[in-house]
């Protein structure tokens, strides 16, 4: 009988064990290397690169910038983001720029934070405030009694409404209207739709982008970005990650109220305005290097690698 009960317990615990391979709880320590190669240039250009910085959950212990091109740091108009600005010339073609971080990251839970949450009620270019989103938000939250419950109702709605799918055209821009209509997309689309509904319900909500540091290995390449969101309820910020909840349904309850420790936030917000301003305008969101030459964007190859550190 005892053996049978043990087997039953393990059977029910198995999804949790499998899911835990994707997250680190508590604290994580890692090195991340963000490296890029300047493409062949025919004229002098301007290169913008997001810089990770410390906050209450993310301590940047070291941030070493190695560049053959002179650089300076600036901040965006909101003050939320730090940005590296360089002016590479044709002679710099093929040269490499490397940013090496050593980070201690804490698992993020519901938390209080200084600042004005009301600024996160404003619409953005691809996250509008409109009667359609207001009607959806009002319908979904009709039975909720406070903003935390409203946020949970909207989280559940987006999770049920959308499916993680990067096929076709239109995904990956963080377009709330696209997400609402297509019912599919990547992390930018999931969270754009969620943030739009929160704001339509008069709940401040914000977007961030960076990396998931793989939990199932201790070194290697990272393929690209990941993004997530937070909403403000009962004087605290509540972290959510709905696209990861869609990919890992067994963690859906966890991802309402938590971001795991194996993350690095690079930038926060949408429609990011910086001086000098790119000819293309504010950054929709800011993850990869952005290079412009003669007012036109030029692709930059970037690679991202990590190594987990002992404390």
Language-model features, listed with the residues they occupy:
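Terminal peptide-recognition signature
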Residues: 47, 154, 229
